[in-house]
């Protein structure tokens, strides 16, 4: 199971946004990457479908099955009903839809957290002052305070998400029967057919009309009195200043888990190690590269030293 999920994640990381532009060779290379992804998807179905079928039989069995008070995720998928395209009423999920949702649940959060962690460490290495301030907070705190009691750690994670949202563009489907569409404060007539709207989340976090010095990594902006004071990982009801996890009823359901993971990982790395530039290196290369996630074009290279006194 772990091997299949790892192969899927590796394939995802190699897929770049498809474009009609580019040379014929670029399109051939991209098609080969997509074919690899499709082949891995077949492997996921072969792996997961027997387990789905076995669980469905267990749920339908008259024999009692005690789950210890916890309900498996797959059981909620059995009960889910979605609109039935081209027909009245609602239907249950198809097997391929369940495979996609289970795969997303098991593995999709890994790549986003890893990408955010690399960006956070890159900026921390590039700015020793941020590392010193963050380590002071982590050393003085307890593990139980990582989630809610370390404001600067929270600010570092938010600043990383503002500058480097894992998915820089979020597409949303608009139905043809929409009453009206609001774009840039202007109402547009409903389209003749369904279409997609792309939200440029990456540009939103770098908007100079909203953020002061938007290209500067400055976690203090999310502390009291900063221009990001009160801004969180999900947008508020009045103004959308950043939305790294989406917004509305389609926001990412894993936002809570992602924030906890990033804080815990970052706190542990600051507590145990010193992070610095490699000897002879001038600065961290913060150039971005578009892949399935927004990643560093040149992977982070750092000199990591275990602290003499581990707190």
What are these regions (language model features)?
Residues 40-117, 145, 150, 172, ...:
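Conserved cytochrome P450 catalytic core segment spanning the I/J/K helices
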Residues 4-6, 139-142, 237-311:
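Cytochrome P450 proximal C-terminal region
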Residues 46, 143-186, 208:
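Conserved cytochrome P450 K-helix E-x-x-R motif and the immediately C-terminal K′/meander segment
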Residues 60-67, 143-151, 185-188, 250-256, ...:
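Conserved, non-catalytic sequence blocks in retroelement Pol enzymes and Pol-derived host proteins
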Residues 112-131, 135-137, 256-273:
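Cytochrome P450 catalytic-core helices
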Residues 199-232:
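Conserved cytochrome P450 K-helix/beta-meander segment immediately N-terminal to the heme-binding cysteine loop
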Residues 191-194:
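Loop/turn positions that initiate beta-strands
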Residues 2-54, 78, 301-308:
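Cytochrome P450 catalytic-domain helical core, especially the substrate-recognition surface
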């Amino acid at each position: 199971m772990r091997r299949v999920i790892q192969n899927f994640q590796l394939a995802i990381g190699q897929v770049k946004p498809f474009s009609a532009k580019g040379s014929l060779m670029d399109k051939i290379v991209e098609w080969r990457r997509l074919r690899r992804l499709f082949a891995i998807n077949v492997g996921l179905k072969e792996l997961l479908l027997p387990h789905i079928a076995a669980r469905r039989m267990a749920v339908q069995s008259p024999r009692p099955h005690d789950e210890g008070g916890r309900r498996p995720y797959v059981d909620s998928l059995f009960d889910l009903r979605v609109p039935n395209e081209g027909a009245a009423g609602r239907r249950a999920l198809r097997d391929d839809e369940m495979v996609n949702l289970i795969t997303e649940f098991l593995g999709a959060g890994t790549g986003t957290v890893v990408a955010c962690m690399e960006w956070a460490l890159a900026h921390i290495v590039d700015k020793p002052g941020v590392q010193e301030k963050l380590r002071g907070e982590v050393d003085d705190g307890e593990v139980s305070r990582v989630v809610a009691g370390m404001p600067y750690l929270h600010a570092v994670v938010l600043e990383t998400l503002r500058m480097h949202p894992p998915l820089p563009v979020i597409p949303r489907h608009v139905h043809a029967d929409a009453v009206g569409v609001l774009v840039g404060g202007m109402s547009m007539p409903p389209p003749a057919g369904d279409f997609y709207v792309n939200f440029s989340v990456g540009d939103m976090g770098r908007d100079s009309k909203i953020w002061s010095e938007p290209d500067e990594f400055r976690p203090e902006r999310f502390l009291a009195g900063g221009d990001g004071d009160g801004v969180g990982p999900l947008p508020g009801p009045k103004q959308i200043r950043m939305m790294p996890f989406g917004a509305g009823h389609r926001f990412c359901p894993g936002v809570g888990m992602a924030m906890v993971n990033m804080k815990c990982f970052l706190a542990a790395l600051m507590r145990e190690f010193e992070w610095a530039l490699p000897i002879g290196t001038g600065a961290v290369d913060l150039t971005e590269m578009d892949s399935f996630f927004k990643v560093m074009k040149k992977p982070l290279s750092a000199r990591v030293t275990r602290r003499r006194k581990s707190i």
